[in-house]
């Protein structure tokens, strides 16, 4: 049990545990239980917008008799609810609001239930008419989310206080006549428990740890200790709004697009037993609170939380195994929930994330202070987009929003990576690991907004682009109008707990009664009263403040956001050589509020800058400089090498990773990603003029201008027509052993290509290409040492790509003018066959003395397309066209210098099936069976998943009959 504290003091507990709540098992009708589940989800959203994930609070409660009436005339959709409590009148003005429910959402049960196995609820009837939202005492800062079916349930917020209302249980309930027309209700009025709660300092813990860095989104952490890893570089304020980290390439970047998080809510048996018939309503109320939080403009994105399915587990053996081990429970739930999800995103019941609510006290690795747990950055991973929430009352709404934040790749606000963005206000936002008080004007921190924007901009939220077909409508009533302060205390501290009135903490902190050593004490978990909780005559709590209900119109009407003007262009990422600069605009003209839509469209624009050539830096490329910058930080030794010298690695790097700073340890062969992104403006690869922008490769011309169409001609002239150079070529054969010169290529040569084709069907014929520098040193295959794999050779600012000596077509190519002369050689070893080596390159023509202006045509090429295969032997194609000086089609181009339109690629062998030896026969006589292992292996012998191998080539006979001898 949670220790109690004396009256007047405040109990603070870390965010992951809200205390041991008395488990009251109650058996009620299943439909009502499911309604409470829906209401809980609705309240989750409202409270998340007002507070934090699992904060201790102070509460008091009162028995009230709600007065409900419909507005006459044209405003017939408006419902007014009056509550007299805590020495004040609370007037709730409510409008129907079931927008968080999918129109055709499915409610399912697992195991024993009083009703049918699955219910498909019509959103226009059944549940949808139950839910309302609105304001309290007209206060524009207030909010309410209520259900008016089977009594009043829900929460509302007024002037820093949260109010929770629900029907009074047992003998405390007396039914009277309601103030509604008889045709609308045949029931009599019912006493309700109204709880009022204020928030204090302190908080509970989330199960996500911040002591390590976060991996890329496609990593798969298996334990809590690796769940919250982060990229190497810290985000900086000027990076706000820009994507960071690796990810799939998106066609539209820096664009604000509407996202829809289709959600399945799951309640285990402990939830069904505790909440009984009110379960579904309770869950939807929580979720509606969370949904409103994700509509706040401080998140800087258009994110809509919707419920498409609710599943209640009535027999725990048929659900996921739920234990006090939060990490294990999360793993079990993630594995279990996948079986209930349709693989097709077009299925109306397909969900993007699943949330398990349980009354089980969750524990972390050291303490039981865990209120929730989720993996980080997994929203579109069907196997890991899930979270576990410990239900400790309506404050579980905060936990829900917080854990969903982790699923959206948000770290805790006090993580070191957020320090430069959040400043000193890291404990006043939803993603605070220990929330003391919520900044209602900005519930999401700058770091949270930056991280979710980066996450979505880098293509990790593509599954959220489809608008749900049949979302479940969420209740619009404020939670405080559904669950009073007393009921809120019962949710948190047990059925015997009541609200402790405290005028100083009205709306800010909910205090509740308890006993310690036989004495009556007040205790709190420092959560505010639920929005909609009455805080005086005509007033209610909204966002921790007690406000007039008459001000409802100021915050009940949604205001849609609109883009403001573009800001000034920022600093250029490079001082020369072609950098990138940005301009941004904000959704602040006006800022969306009251659930209004966030702006859609491009939020960031970028352009090229400082495109002039850089001064010669010993012939080093810009990527070389970035790799070498890590030399002084790399003191670890590899083998006998005293230190590490880093050089760029291009060969073997996946196209999607070209804009990571992948560097190779010189002379060793190890390579690492030293930075998740190169500096903006860095060329993507030596054979392309495209440049990197925020970790993604974008097209640029040879003039270093983004979106320019200019290309280098064969002479290496940007935008040239190929008329300023001439082709030099030759074919050489040799039979003598040792090293022999083929050709010395002078400085200034462009488009160098040397080909050495081995005999058909042979990987090598005893002859290999080599390169010697002008000073006599070898930069390739010298001293009878061969490089068998594809690699890039960086020499004096020139990058040469070598195919590797084991390739069927041994080849050397260049992509920029040669800075110094190089000699191409052939190495003959053993009884080598006579090699045939062909070379071509282009040299600048000498200046002519006459003034004739000839008509020129040239071959114009486009960039290489994708390889036809990822392994084995594939091909790449590109468009090669003959055009005149004006860019029009022509036919005068010399065919002998026509660039190739195809080239081989993907030389690495494909994964293949490998069978093991047969096992002994299962019988020593007569007909038995034998079997052998089957596995998928890579070209280097590593074991892969079976999906990596060709299923059409899978051996069929890895089990067979056998007969050693006939039985006598």
Curated annotation (Swiss-Prot):
Q: Motif Cysteine switch at which residues?
A: 204-211
Residues with an annotated glycan are 548, 721, 765, 783, 946
Binding residues annotated for Ca(2+) 1, in chain numbering: 262, 345, 352, 463, 466
Q: Please provide an example of a Pfam family that matches this protein in its UniProt record.
A: TSP1_ADAMTS
User: Which GO BP annotation is one of this protein's?
Assistant: extracellular matrix organization
Q: Does the keyword Calcium apply?
A: yes
Q: What class of enzyme is it?
A: hydrolase
Q: Where is the region Disordered?
A: 1-23, 177-253
Q: Where is the TSP type-1 domain?
A: 560-615, 855-911, 912-968
Query: Which locations, inside or outside the cell, does it occupy?
Result: Secreted, Extracellular space, Extracellular matrix
Name the GO cellular-component terms.
Answer: basement membrane; cytoplasmic vesicle; extracellular matrix; extracellular region
Keywords attached to this entry: Calcium, Cleavage on pair of basic residues, Disulfide bond, Extracellular matrix, Glycoprotein, Heparin-binding, Hydrolase, Metal-binding, Metalloprotease, Protease, Repeat, Secreted, Signal, Zinc, Zymogen
Entry's transmembrane regions? none
Give me the residues that bind Zn(2+), please. 206, 402, 406, 412
Q: How is the cofactor bound?
A: Binds 1 zinc ion per subunit.
- UniProt KW Transcription regulation keyword: no
Protein role: Metalloprotease which cleaves aggrecan, a cartilage proteoglycan, at the '1691-Glu-|-Leu-1692' site (within the chondroitin sulfate attachment domain), and may be involved in its turnover. Also cleaves COMP. Has angiogenic inhibitor activity. May play a critical role in follicular rupture.
Q: What is this protein called?
A: A disintegrin and metalloproteinase with thrombospondin motifs 1
- Source organism: Mus musculus (Mouse)
Species classification? Eukaryota, Metazoa, Chordata, Craniata, Vertebrata
State the encoding gene.
Adamts1
